From Swiss-Prot:
Involved in GDP-mannose biosynthesis which serves as the activated sugar nucleotide precursor for mannose residues in cell surface polysaccharides. This enzyme participates in synthesis of the LPS group C2 O antigen. Keywords: GTP-binding, Lipopolysaccharide biosynthesis, Nucleotide-binding, Nucleotidyltransferase, Transferase. Pfam families: ManC_GMP_beta-helix, MannoseP_isomer, NTP_transferase. Homodimer. It comes from the Bacteria. It is an enzyme of class 2 (transferase). The keyword RNA-binding does not apply. This is Mannose-1-phosphate guanylyltransferase. Pathway: Nucleotide-sugar biosynthesis; GDP-alpha-D-mannose biosynthesis; GDP-alpha-D-mannose from alpha-D-mannose 1-phosphate (GTP route): step 1/1; Bacterial outer membrane biogenesis; LPS O-antigen biosynthesis. The keyword RNA-binding does not apply. The gene is rfbM.
Length: 473
């Protein structure tokens, strides 16, 4: 039996679930059920397949977030491929194919390509379709999974099936772009069309050979990029300059629409790409009034709403069909039928050089996290959590001084030539232009308040004097 390696596509910045989804914390890292994130669920649902460790492909800027989420489910194993620049799905999958052939000695593994931000409600049907597709993939076919449509949907591409090549498997007649409503309705009524899920199964060599034949520029650039892989803790770093030369293209355009070896396997597993707040409402558990409620919420005489609150109490009276999402720094109120226009809010924030589209007030770092409590002219207050054993790299700031007050735990601090320890209710002052580090030597998290003061308080006022991951000494 061929080794099966999941390839999880975790790139993208996702704006359709703003304000929960941000550039630095996109939807694949969100939890839609209050427990695991979409990325974690994507990996966990593969457990019955007894597959190899997943290869996760992500943006360089999301690397520590991915690493922490994999660590939390015991799936971190030097298996995160970093894209130095975005080049769409065809090159990303090629990187995974090349890496898998390097990692699996004397084998040509099957690659199960999945998006990190999809929801599957019927996992048994999902796994059955994968097991069925393995037969065709081992024969050199490039299998795509077509979702049996439940309605006329204009937001998805479609796959038209051709001749049957076995039970519940067909050749691909054509891939079609997102249709208008009447065309989509015709597709659904014909029972010959499936939603294009963006999920695939094929041998690593089969994909690379088709890519080489159909898109040789992509193949060559990716081969060059993995020619000098630089392992970096849990990350696989490819050659940035070589990959920057790669054309940007999707797997559909570069390969699947042109190959003679495409096979579509239908799947009816309660799939959703969670592409909007309304689709999230569709798949979520509802109360008797068909409201989806997350947080401290009282909905009176209100129906068909999606209401989410991080911390504040929200009450509604006599409202229907709304999406209300409140985070620490933003509030979205929209008719459920208009949520596709949330992109206009993101565009507005970008045009006005605001931060609410980019990051949350709580920001994750390799050593832990911080949240902005308050800010004003020439000062900024943060609450910082440092993981056990983690530390800041040696650094200094040109334009700001810092006061550190320990709330709980113990901090081992290097300030200039001094090395000392402070504990709960103790503090220290770090002047500007002073080299300093901080480590949590304990087995419990370190909590501290940081008060910054100075003429320039942006995150880029930092001079790092050592390269440091934040995980180890």
């Amino acid at each position: 039996m061929s080794k099966l390696i999941p390839v999880i596509m975790a790139g993208g910045i996702g704006s359709r679930l703003w304000p929960l989804s941000r550039e630095e914390h996109p939807k694949q890292f969100l939890s839609v059920d209050g427990e695991l994130s979409m990325l974690q669920n994507t990996i966990k649902r593969l457990t019955p397949l007894l597959a190899g460790e997943p290869l996760v492909i992500c943006n360089d800027s999301h690397r520590f977030l991915v690493a922490e989420q994999l660590r939390a489910i015991n799936k971190l194993a030097n298996n995160i491929i970093l894209e130095p620049v975005g080049r769409n799905t065809a090159p990303a999958i090629a990187l995974a194919a090349f890496c898998s052939l390097q990692n699996v000695v004397d084998e040509d593994p099957l690659l199960l390509v999945l998006a990190a931000d999809h929801v599957i409600r019927d996992e048994k049907v999902f796994l059955k379709a994968i097991n069925h597709a393995e037969f065709f993939a081992t024969q050199g076919k490039l299998v795509t999974f077509g979702i049996v449509p439940t309605q006329a949907e204009t937001g998805y591409g479609y796959i038209c099936r051709g001749e049957a090549i076995g039970e519940d498997a067909f050749s691909v007649a054509e891939f079609v772009e997102k249709p208008d409503f009447d065309t989509a309705r015709h597709y659904v009524e014909s029972e010959k069309y499936y939603w294009n899920s963006g999920m695939f199964l094929f041998r690593a060599s089969s994909y690379l050979q088709e890519l080489k034949d159909l898109s040789p520029d992509i193949y060559q650039a990716c081969e060059n990029a993995v020619g000098s892989i630089n392992p970096d803790l849990d990350f696989i770093r490819i050659d940035k300059e070589a990959f920057a030369m790669c054309p940007s293209d999707s797997i559909d355009y570069a390969v699947m629409e042109h190959t003679r070896h495409a096979v579509v396997v239908p799947m009816n597993a309660g799939w959703s790409d969670v592409g909007s707040w309304s689709s999230l409402w569709d798949i979520s558990k509802k109360d008797p009034q068909r409201n989806v409620l997350h947080g401290d919420i009282f909905a009176y005489n209100s129906k068909d709403n999606y209401i989410y609150s991080e911390k504040s109490f929200i009450s509604t009276i006599g409202v229907n069909n709304l999406v209300i999402v409140q985070t620490a720094d933003a509030l979205l109120v929209s008719d459920k039928d208009s949520v596709q226009d949330v992109k206009k809010v993101v565009d507005y924030l970008k045009a006005n050089n605001r931060n609410e589209h980019k990051k949350h007030l709580e920001v994750f770092r390799p050593w832990g996290k911080f949240s902005v409590i308050h800010s004003g002219d020439n000062y900024l207050v943060k609450r910082i959590t440092v993981k056990p054993g983690a530390k800041f790299a040696a650094q200094m700031h040109l334009h700001r001084a810092e006061h550190w007050i320990v709330v709980s735990g113990t901090a081992c601090i290097t300030k200039g030539e001094e090395i000392f320890t402070i504990s709960e209710n103790e503090s220290t002052f770090i002047p500007a232009n002073t080299v300093h580090t901080l480590k949590n030597p304990a087995t419990i998290p370190l909590e501290l308040i940081e008060i910054q003061s100075g003429t320039y308080l942006a995150e880029d006022d930092i001079i790092r004097l050592e390269k440091h991951s934040g995980y180890l000494e």
